Amino acid sequence: MAFFSTVKARVFVLFFILLSNSVQAQKDQLVIPRDVRSAYEKGTRSPDGQPGANYWQNRAEYDIKAELIPAQRRLRGTQQIIYYNQSPDSLNRLVIRLYQDILKKGNLRDWPVNESDLHNGMVIERLLINGQSFDLSAGNETVTRSGTNLTIKLNQPISPGNQAIVEMDWYFTISRTSNIRMGAYDSTTFFIAYWYPQIAVYDDVNGWDTYNYSGIQEYYNDFNDFQVEITVPKNFMVWATGDLQNVSDVLAPEYVQRYQTGQISDTVLKVISEDDLARGGTTLYKDKLTWIYQAHNVPDFAFGSSDHYLWDMVSLVVDERAPRRVIINAVYNPQSADFYGVADISRKVLEFFSTRMPGVPYPYPVMTVFNGSGGMEFPMIVNNGSQSSFAGTVGLTAHEIAHTYFPFYMGINERKYAWMDEGWAVMLPWEFQSSMVENNDRLATTIVEFNFSSGKEMDLPLLTPSIVYSSHVHYPGYRFNSYTKAAVAYQILRELLGEDLFRQALHEFMRRWNGKHPLPWDFFFTFDAVAGENLSWFWNSWFIEPGYPDLGIGQVKQKSGKSEIEIIRHGNMVIPVQLRVVFDDDSEEIIKKSARVWQNSVERIIVPVKHKKKIKRLELGHIHIPDINRQNNTVTF
């Protein structure tokens, strides 16, 4: 795409490294697990970081008609899925995710729930595949329902290049108190996610993704098209993934005009105000209204609905070359004081992401921030709770919108590699957060959090599959690895490569893999290619091996006009060196060295300092550099 930097990558021939299955003999080699290695052998992945010549992925088209029944807290739906098998394999079964079975009585989950929210799971009233009806009652050997997966053995396999048509009628009860990323927030406010029966991912590494949805782990979806009709009672509005297709069929004419004006407005416009709610008549006078949304090439669909939410709208040109303008909505409870500024914050953060970091124009036509609870991302819409501080509102808004790029634009498998999206969502908005809130150094705060947990028992290597943390007991480890540790790793990589080369590599990774399913090794090899060097020593240190960062000052040899200062790497994680030399007149010199000095397993370096004055104090490190033990970082003479 035009907005990406042009990169002429110097690609190393690394086949012998990439396809190695033995324990590494040298620190500059990466080991690839057997199941992942097979993808490179089959040519679906390439050792230069590109999608392979034989790369493929499946997709689907969803046509969903759903009705929200607030009085019953029920969502009822009928849907048709056209599933396209673009793999080289004949598929003799289909795996369908029934996310709402997480609240099914007797099912395992790693998220605490209120017993009153437990139910019979997703109730499926009809299932047809290519016109064949399937009996879901117990004892049918062609159907297996386990955890949150429904697996159907097919009489006629789906051959390569062919498709299957899946038709279903279903309903479920919406949770009231155990709101795992969705639910009822009051009697007439709902956020609906993880809701429709969804065909699981079948990929080139593991075949069917059969991990159950247990609460902690989030996304791994194919890129699909959605046509969704959502029927709600009169006075209810619906905000969702995608473009609203029939605004004139649901809003009263006055509000249609406001909606259309807001689509091109550079200042925040109130589509629905408190006075409007008090007066009534914001929607057309019908007992039921059907809101129609379309979304193309996205990994999921979610929506929110309420009859008493305020609605602010503004827009932004995210790509001057197109030019392309994005609609930004904030919809919220009138009691949520912080949300009155969210539309403006969202516009500013979209501008930052589009032009600064990552510097890739926001890829979708809409962004809606819905005032529900917690903080959870979905394509083109996020579900955010109210925050007690402006810094909290800025941080949550920026973080959830950052997920647009990772995992949605990039198709990340969060179930296995949550650090490939959460870490970026922490790191990308740091500068924005600092610019919006005085004395809000989020990088420094993250380093403090990192230093507290790094090297402890729950600190596992980043490449540990996220599903390993599938227990609420293990959530602190999941949180540290996926968010804090990954964000710091990306920042150290940024410092190592320098700003320009880091951006080139990030842009190239995004250009190559947007709309696909990159693995960690695709990320590693792309950065190797763009950097023009084998960075395995860095990947091993930060992503593969257990460990922690700890630098200390060793021996100091002082001579006339020159001193030699020994810096010792006590920990095995590589970090940059920053040495502050304070002289007896309180003047100072700052010496910086890249983490590259620790390449080739170097454990100590000598930093020479030329000086005419007497050294009074040496201080190693910085608030932006992780180091779990600062006690060995200072020497006073």
Give the positions of each predicted feature.
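Hydrophobic alpha-helical and helix-loop surface patches within well-folded domains
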Residues: 25-47, 58-60, 293, 327-568
